[in-house]
Amino acid sequence: MADFQSFTQEITGLGYVSSDNVFLFTHQQGPDVVFVPMGTMDHNIDSERYTIIIHEDVWKLRTHAVINRLKALTGQTRRVHGRACKIKRIDQKTAADFLENYHTGGYINTYYKYGIYFEQDLLAVALFAKCRTFQTT
């Protein structure tokens, strides 16, 4: 928990209050961030602002992805215009590596995999399943 508190205070400038082991971090321009330790319920969280709930297990497993997401939501990342980007088909390893490093949900196997590139940097991936035909009766 201490590493989460120090990150939010030093990097994003979020202040926090604690209640029943649930920590609420507030930011003037960004969303409220709620850190929920393992074994704690989050269903009683009431906020009038946009709220992000971060569970302790996600923080421990995918810290880098959570940090990047919080930085993006608090305006600490560089914006790139979509017209300056290129879309290319990517392989399974590239998609899996990117999602394991930068996405809190990780990777799932799909049929179509595309990368969004700015210059030589992979900024995002888009994954799509094969088209399915449903029979109606």
Residues covered by each model-derived region:
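Interaction modules related to DNA damage response and DNA replication/repair
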Residues: 19-26
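Short beta-strand-loop-alpha-helix junction that forms the active-site gateway
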Residues: 26-44, 131-133
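Acidic-basic catalytic patches of nuclease active cores, encompassing PD-(D/E)XK
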Residues: 1-19
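A conserved beta-strand-loop-helix scaffold within acyl/acetyltransferase catalytic domains
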Residues: 65-137
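Short aromatic/hydrophobic-glycine micro-motifs
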Residues: 13-16, 49-50, 104
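Catalytic cores of nucleic-acid endonucleases
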Residues: 40-65
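Generic structural motif
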Residues: 14-18, 35, 87-88
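Hydrophobic/aromatic beta-strand patches that form the interior of the parallel beta-sheet core
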Residues: 34, 52-54, 114
